[in-house]
Design a protein with these regions (language model features):
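Active-site-adjacent loops and short helices of periplasmic peptidoglycan-processing enzymes
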Residues: 1-127
Length: 127
């Protein structure tokens, strides 16, 4: 339990257990993709990205993308968040490239300052 007003941890279960970031990376990918689309003045409903072979063969949970398929950012965000599609995350990352990594790391660094949880590190979010 976190006191968001004072940004303090009040109670924690298994607080020293190291956990994978898993879907947190997908949430960060979605947030940063939306920020980048806005910054670049891209309409997420009419801007299309092409699915690469690398993206559609990414291991893990999938949005069932197909090599060569063309999808809007909106569709990719749905594929990213609803079935937790690693393939959709890869398409967004490939198309936003280094900007996505830089913005994700910047956001993670900012969050780390706000959420002062011992032994917790969000930064660097992407190496």
């Amino acid at each position: 339990m976190i006191d968001t007003f004072h940004t303090k941890v009040l109670q924690a279960k298994n607080k020293d257990e190291v956990r994978e970031m898993a879907s947190l990376t997908k949430m960060m990918t979605a947030i940063v993709s939306l920020e980048l689309a806005e910054e670049m003045r891209l309409d997420i409903r009419t801007t299309y990205f092409k699915v690469s072979y690398k993206a559609c063969t990414t291991i893990g949970t999938t949005a069932n993308t197909v090599d060569g398929q063309v999808m809007t950012i909106w569709e990719l965000l749905h594929g990213l968040m609803l079935p937790s599609g690693n393939d959709a995350a890869m398409v967004l990352a490939e198309n936003f490239s280094n900007r996505l990594i830089l913005n994700a790391n910047r956001s993670a660094k900012e969050e780390e300052k706000v959420i002062e949880v011992p032994k917790c590190s969000f930064y660097p979010f992407v190496k």
